[in-house]
Amino acid sequence: MIDKKLLLQDFEMVALSLKKRNNAMDDALERLREVITHYKKQLIELEGLQAFQNKVSKEFGIKMAQKVDTSDLKKELENNKIKLNELSKSVGELEQQIDLRLSIIPNLVDEKTPLGASEEDNIEIKKILTPRNFTFKPKEHFELAQQNGWIDFESGVKLAKSRFSVIRGFGAKIYRALIHLMLDFNEKNGFEIIYTPALVNEKMLFGTGQLPKFKEDVFKIENENLYLIPTAEVTLTNLYNDTIVSVEKLPIKMTAHTPCFRSEAGSAGKDTRGMIRQHQFDKVELVAITHPKESDAMQEHMLESASEILKALELPHRFVQLCSADLGFSASNTIDIEVWLPGQNCYREISSVSNTRDFQARRAKIRFKENQKNQLAHTLNGSSLAVGRTMVALMENHQQADGSIHIPKALEKYL
């Protein structure tokens, strides 16, 4: 959540930053401006009534001590108190309105994030490993998966519906091996392995920014205040919800392997074949809670940690800086890692490492104590990696002319 104090003090600066997102925030901001204007006006009136109440109360006390008639002052105090209570209630309601409207407004755009109108304005930072030159036309992963008997898409539809799949045979062994490899690399880089619930309550989804704005993107358990997690970012970050840690414990670095569940609202017609876009998928996540001065360096560390896995699997990839219009709701700055898919002849996102600054920390009340003072931490999150998409990249990049798949050396010991 944006700092309410900053919003009240410098609305224009906040509005200018949010307009960089290019996602029609004007109406929401204008409504928020109206509420804030009304709130400030009533707050001034309230402060005036409080000052008047204090002044008359002193006069009342003096006259009482002097045993002078105080009936007029008493009546004045009673009338003013009624006004005070009514106005205080109104100010409280307006403050709640501001908080509610703030909860659906995205994070401020970081100064390092380039201005852009769409994903077309994202900027490639660097490429790692050169894509292989094939002597044959490379197949897409769903062809290879079916040929090798690794993924059963029809059974996924039978058991659930479209955008579900069944991984079996040697494909299941590779899938499991990828998870183990990812966790081992992340642990080597200082991230604590944690297993969390796959269900969370509404407060946790509010803390990381999925609710209330993106309710249609998550699966809710009927008649329960529980939701299936869209990412382990939710559980790992919220382990420290409403918590104050000592500055000596920072940074807190965590990794988790979880199933993730997304409704994919608005994705009709996109990636309908294969494993690129599923309702249920596995992901190994990185989350860090840091001192504000250390979050930029942590973002680089998390990117390199994810890249290290792709290099070990001999998968060409690149870093892409997202522009202002392509940022996620909670992110202030995001760098994607895209992996090369020769079957599709393009790079596709496999990780997205975001610095949310203090946006999530303010929503979730994640703080640290330094010099006897409580401060908001910075939180970061990123995939390391999306397991299904890594398997897709492995199949497409390491396919042989006969459709068999070469297994990278780094993965052999896990099989």
Curated annotation (Swiss-Prot):
The keyword Cytoplasm applies. GO terms for biological process: selenocysteine biosynthetic process; seryl-tRNA aminoacylation. Its EC number is 6.1.1.11. Keywords: Aminoacyl-tRNA synthetase, ATP-binding, Cytoplasm, Ligase, Nucleotide-binding, Protein biosynthesis. It catalyses: tRNA(Ser) + L-serine + ATP = L-seryl-tRNA(Ser) + AMP + diphosphate + H(+); tRNA(Sec) + L-serine + ATP = L-seryl-tRNA(Sec) + AMP + diphosphate + H(+). Signal peptide: none annotated. Pathway: Aminoacyl-tRNA biosynthesis; selenocysteinyl-tRNA(Sec) biosynthesis; L-seryl-tRNA(Sec) from L-serine and tRNA(Sec): step 1/1. It is an enzyme of class 6 (ligase). L-serine binds at T231, A232, E233, E285, S383. Homodimer. The tRNA molecule binds across the dimer. Consists of two distinct domains, a catalytic core and a N-terminal extension that is involved in tRNA binding. Belongs to the class-II aminoacyl-tRNA synthetase family. Type-1 seryl-tRNA synthetase subfamily. Catalyzes the attachment of serine to tRNA(Ser). Is also able to aminoacylate tRNA(Sec) with serine, to form the misacylated tRNA L-seryl-tRNA(Sec), which will be further converted into selenocysteinyl-tRNA(Sec). This is Serine--tRNA ligase. The gene is serS.
